[in-house]
C-alpha cells in the first residue's frame, strides 16, 4: 500500500506541474467533448445527447461489422485495434480491409450480434442498470466493461463507494455464473481518475476485475506511454485503452501538429506491449464531440478518412 500511495502522489504532482501532461481535462474543457453515451438509433442529429436513454441501435445492413478478425497481426490495426462506435450515428460499421478485432458502443447494444468483430458491452452508468440487466445476456458477448468516466460530472458521475454495489449486483454475477471477462470503470485522464479507481479497488476487494480500462487525451507519445504504464504497474492487470486521441483539452489553441505521427507512435507502442490487450482510437464518428476533427477516423459521408485507413490498416 505504501508503494501504491507513493505512485499516486508522484503521479498527481506531475500532473499539477504540467496540466497538459497525461491529457488532464478540467471539467469545463471535458464538457466540450459531450456525453459519450448511447443515442437513439433513429436519430439523425449529430449531437451527443439523446431525448431518451432506453432505445437501442439497429442495423440497416446485414453487412454491419464487416472488418475481418486478424490472425496475430502486429501492424497498426492488428488484433488489438478496436472501434468506438456511437449508437445511432450510423446504422452500420463500415466494411473495410483493415484488421481491427473488436468494438464498443458505450452501451449494452451491439450493432449486429454475430458479426465479425468482437463486441464489448459497456455498462455506461447507474441510470442504465435496468437496461443492462435486461439485455446483457443476449448481447452476443462475454466481455463487459464498467462505468464511463465515473468521476466526471458530465459523464456517468458517481463516487467510487457508491459504485461498488452496482458492480456487485450487475457485474460480478456475469463472471461467476456466465464466465464473462470484466473490465474496470474507464476513468478520464484527470488526476482524480486513478484516485477514484484506487478507492473503488480498496472498497471492493471481492470485485473480480480482469483488466483495467482507461481513457487518455494529450499530445505527446511519451506522456501517453507513461500514463498507461502507471496504470499497469499500479494495479498489475492488463490494459484496455478504450478511448485515446491526440487532443489537448487544457489549451485548445495548442493541438497536435502531426496527428498521423502521434497515432503511428502510440499504436506501435501499444501493439508492442504484452500487457496492453486492446485499444480504440477516438473516434469513428462524424461528430467528434469537441475533439479535434483531425483525429476523426470517419469522413462526413461515412467513409473512412485517411487517418481511419491508417488506424485499421497500417
Q: Language-model segments: which ranges?
A:
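Aromatic- and acid-rich polysaccharide-binding/catalytic face
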Residues: 148, 197-249, 282-283
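Fungal secretory targeting signals
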Residues: 1-36
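Active-site groove signature of glycoside hydrolases
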Residues: 138-160, 181-191, 207-216, 240-241, ...
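Loop/turn elements at helix/coil->beta-strand transitions in domains of secreted/extracellular proteins
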Residues: 77-81, 98-102, 115-119, 139-143, ...
